[in-house]
Regions:
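Alpha-helical transmembrane signal-anchor/signal-peptide segments
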Residues: 37-55
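A cross-kingdom signal targeting lumenal/periplasmic-facing segments of multi-pass membrane
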Residues: 81-228, 232-233
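Twin-arginine (Tat) signal peptide motif
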Residues: 12-16
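Active-site-proximal structural scaffolding
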Residues: 21-25, 51, 193, 218
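Short extracytoplasmic
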Residues: 50-83
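Short beta-strand-initiation
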Residues: 46, 77-79, 148
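N-terminal Lys/Arg-rich, disordered targeting/topogenic segments
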Residues: 1-11
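Hydrophobic membrane-insertion alpha-helices, especially the h-region
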Residues: 17-33
Length: 235
């Protein structure tokens, strides 16, 4: 009986500790959001409508527009969708950059949710299967963070294969983990009054299982795009 009582006592203390931690977290969030982050900052930036469509040997025939409902669902403030072509490669590379001026839920939530949607969650819903998924160091010139990481995926739909790179580029950071994105949004909201950020994604076809050429095409185009991004995605 003594052992049972002792076990119940320990379980009770553990429950109290968890409750206190939860309450402390709620209080800290309330204080942070309502006192330290009362006046959000929105850095100056250029609109993606001004982004150059010719980058050396790479060219894009024109920016692609998404329908308004999709834009609302994604919560993007501004975006760029472009299919870059180069005569040296037998396909185009899809480049998407979605900029969110704020990632704070608007009053009432719902359609006011502005946080960045992880591509790994959306791809299966559009019919693509993720057959390889890894986190890699993204050592490409033009990035603000030389220690940044990206998600590298191989996706498939029927016989089609694609190489996908994506990462979150927000307030000078380059990160791939969803939980880090959430943590830094809260931290920067409190300390810098900023929650702006972007999702950057490159999608490259893989033909005849030639993943090496797809990788080379990505490494060829990416530095040219990234060198121009600071004007559109502020550090």
């Amino acid at each position: 009986m003594a052992e049972i009582v002792a076990g119940e006592d320990r379980a009770g203390r553990s429950g109290v500790i968890k409750t206190l931690v939860a309450v402390a977290f709620i209080v800290a969030n309330f204080y942070t959001y309502h006192f330290l982050a009362s006046t959000p900052k929105y850095p100056d930036r250029q609109q993606f409508s001004e982004f150059p469509l010719h980058l050396d040997e790479w060219s894009c025939p024109g920016l692609v527009s998404m329908d308004e409902q999709t834009r609302i669902n994604l919560g993007v403030t501004d975006y760029m969708i472009c299919r870059f072509a180069n005569a040296a490669y037998p396909y185009t590379i899809d480049v998407y950059v979605g900029y969110h001026a704020s990632q704070v839920r608007e009053e009432g939530g719902g359609a006011g949710e502005n946080s960045i949607h992880p591509p790994a969650h959306c791809l299966p819903g559009s019919g693509w299967d993720i057959i390889a998924n890894s986190t890699v160091r993204i050592d490409i010139p033009g990035l603000p963070d030389p220690q940044g990481t990206a998600k590298r995926m191989i996706i498939a739909k029927g016989k089609a294969r694609r190489l996908v790179y994506y990462w979150y580029q927000s307030r000078g950071r380059v990160i791939s983990e969803d939980w880090k994105k959430i943590v830094y949004v809260g931290l920067d909201r409190a300390l810098r009054q900023r929650t702006d950020g972007s999702l950057i994604r490159f999608t490259i076809p893989i033909e005849r299982n030639d993943e090496q050429t797809s990788e080379r095409a990505f490494r060829d185009l990416a530095p040219r795009v990234l060198a121009l991004l600071p004007a559109y995605v502020p550090d």
